[in-house]
Curated annotation (Swiss-Prot):
This is Probable cytochrome P450 6a13. Heme binds at C435. Gene3D superfamilies: Cytochrome P450. The keyword Iron applies. GO terms for cellular component: endoplasmic reticulum membrane. It is an enzyme of class 1 (oxidoreductase). One of its GO terms (biological process) is defense response to bacterium. CDD domains: CYP6-like. May be involved in the metabolism of insect hormones and in the breakdown of synthetic insecticides. InterPro entries: Cyt_P450 (IPR001128), Cyt_P450_CS (IPR017972), Cyt_P450_E_grp-I (IPR002401), Cyt_P450_sf (IPR036396), Insect_CytP450_Detox (IPR050476).
Length: 493
């Protein structure tokens, strides 16, 4: 019995010493930071009462005025939390070669759809990035634009059948699902007519019914190598099977009928043809199609719904934007064209301010690929060190954006932008690992808003949540209770 007690005590003591040494990593290097809790690090409350933005803001506000960076622990995983904008510029652009990786979870063996541009690193990411960039040129956007307009008309038709109390996130998600289905897959998803269409159900399953809790997701992305060894999956099997079958049927149909379209699937087909160097496998093609679909429909619909929310709470902004939209449409014979969208500067400001207040990602992740000395310091990062860039916290810094909770599109007038540090605004990231679909995402948001503001007026309802509370179950910034508004029809000019 005594031997057992001694053994338990010894093991406990060794564990304590090891944990204490591990969690003193940053303090031993002279880096300030919140005192971590054993096993939880700085994550206490995450997924229960707190969202990632709450934790990041707490740390940012505590250290921003006195430190350029601080130590940060996601459970057991150590990261450097960067607050200095010049240092962020160094990491994302000047010294990009030292921080080219994101270090995100992927498990191609058990979950092949995780082998996509968003999650991959190294040569695989570089090859995909170089080849997929051509999908998002301005020329390609002009080619896809008529598809967006067609879905925009269907959006207003669907809205006329449900004036009154609406849940804006679902409405916007049905719109963006149909846009992505048309522009990426050449398919009619019909989510606006049928909210329970298969594409809509699968998209909702990924975003609203994730396979794992936010705590498990945090573990997977904090310890991707361990999660991969434990054979974790990110997507539900039925979601993977649906997208694999959809892509397989689309490819087979186009090859059989010799159909050629200027869209994402066509480019992926060409990158998978025999004779192409490092040609994509079928699973790799499906993985890129999936991430484009998920990123395109969910992030854009979230931005659209947040924008409608702010317009409902700020009727003066809504009316000024509607006046601009109607004036541009009148000049163009009531037709919306790719060029006419560029004639709406206030629309651009409104969307930019929405992304400032509600960036989709609470923070950006980078991982060092080599030893790196932080400029103007003695701190040397080891290869594999993780970096956190707190986008949401930066966007809510009152020194950068006075009264940050106020929705104020004038922050994005040209002279205001010029007066700010260029890295004070990071909704799409920066540098070679910025969001490849930025142009497409903003364009479909603007098209949707133009059609909605042309025909409808939005205001708060009894169910409107003020202020909005973010869902603690999701890493992305999304609402807990939805975006409930009142929608009234307007007479067309």
């Amino acid at each position: 019995m005594l031997t057992l007690l001694v053994l338990v005590f010894t093991v406990g003591l060794l564990l304590y010493v090891k944990l204490r040494w591990h969690y003193s990593y940053w303090s031993r290097r002279g880096v300030a930071g919140e005192r971590p809790v054993y096993f939880r690090g700085n994550m206490s409350g995450l997924g229960r009462d707190l969202h990632w933005t709450d934790i990041n803001l707490r740390i940012y506000r505590k250290f921003r005025g006195v430190e350029r960076y601080c130590g940060y622990f996601t459970f057991m995983t150590k990261s450097l939390f960067i607050m200095d904008l010049e240092l962020i510029r160094d990491i994302m652009i000047r010294d990009f070669s030292s921080f080219a990786d994101r270090g995100l979870f992927h498990n191609v063996r058990d979950d092949p759809l995780t082998g996509n541009l968003l999650f991959l690193d190294g040569p695989e990411w570089r090859w995909l990035r170089q080849n997929l960039t051509q999908v998002f040129t301005s020329g390609k956007m002009k080619f896809m634009f008529p598809n967006m307009v067609e879905v925009g008309e269907k959006l207003t038709q669907a809205c006329r059948l449900q004036v009154g109390e609406i849940e804006a996130k679902d409405l916007c998600a049905r719109f963006t699902t149909d846009v992505i289905g048309s522009c990426a897959f050449g398919l009619e998803c019909n989510s606006l007519q049928d909210p329970e269409s298969q594409f809509r159900r699968m998209g909702r399953s990924v975003t609203q019914e994730p396979l794992h809790s936010v705590l498990v997701q945090a573990f997977m992305f904090a310890q991707p190598e361990l999660a991969r060894k434990l054979r974790f999956r990110l997507f539900r099997p039925e979601v993977s099977e649906f997208f694999l079958d959809t892509v397989r049927q689309t490819l087979d149909y186009r090859r059989r009928e010799n159909i050629h379209r200027n869209d994402l699937i066509q480019l992926l087909m060409e990158l998978g043809e025999e004779g192409v160097k490092d040609a994509l496998s079928f699973e790799q093609i499906a993985a890129q199609a999936l991430v484009f679909f998920l990123a395109g429909f969910d992030t854009s619909s979230t931005t659209m719904s947040f924008c409608l929310y702010e317009l409902a709470l700020n009727p003066d902004v809504q009316e000024r934007l509607r006046v601009e939209v109607l004036a541009v449409l009148k000049r163009n014979n009531q037709k919306l064209t790719y060029d006419s969208v560029q004639e709406m500067p206030y629309l651009d400001q409104v969307v930019a301010e929405t992304l400032r207040k509600y960036p989709i990602l609470p923070h950006l992740l980078r991982r060092s690929t080599k030893e790196y000395q932080i400029p103007n310091s003695n701190l040397i990062l080891e290869p594999g060190s993780k970096i956190i860039i707190p986008v949401h916290s930066i966007h809510h810094d009152p020194e950068l954006y006075p009264d940050p909770e106020k929705f104020d599109p004038s922050r994005f007038e040209p002279e205001e932008i010029k007066a700010r540090h260029p890295f004070a605004y990071l909704p799409f990231g920066e540098g070679p690992r910025n969001c490849i679909g930025e142009r497409f995402g903003k364009l479909q948001v603007k098209v949707g808003l133009v059609y909605l503001l042309r025909d409808f007026k939005f205001s708060r309802s009894e169910k409107t949540q003020i202020p909005l509370k973010f869902s603690s179950r999701n890493f992305l910034i999304s609402t807990q209770e939805g975006v409930h508004l009142r929608m009234e029809g307007l007479e067309r000019p």
